[in-house]
Amino acid sequence: KAYMDYVDKRFRLLAESAPYFKKVKELGGRIDGNMSRVLSPGALDDSGAMCAAMIKAMTKGSKTDLMPLIDNYINYIMTKEHRLSDGTFARNRPFFNSVWLDDMFMGIPPVAWYAKVAGSNAQKYSDEAAK
């Protein structure tokens, strides 16, 4: 219970402050680099673990509306993260099409967990995580 309260309090802070900072960014203002990575992930490092943790918190009873953040993260993971032609997560640093175990750890679990909250699209995310 104490740990869940701790997690929920921090996720609530992100969920409640993200819309404000999103508006600031849209209006051309500068925002903190950490919040920028929440709003505009640029790597699995910015999105994977947070996405999976937020989904887990939701499935464990968090009352905070995390879906806008989760959807933003999963959109990055599914549509913007670099992949090989077969769909394997990869990166272009330090070398072109480098495959890292770390990317599997940060990419596959959030996709698999998203199947739990994806409603009628659950099979799509389960299949993606398994391939």
Features from the language model and the residues they span:
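Glycan-recognition and catalytic cores of secretory/periplasmic carbohydrate-active enzymes
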Residues: 1-131
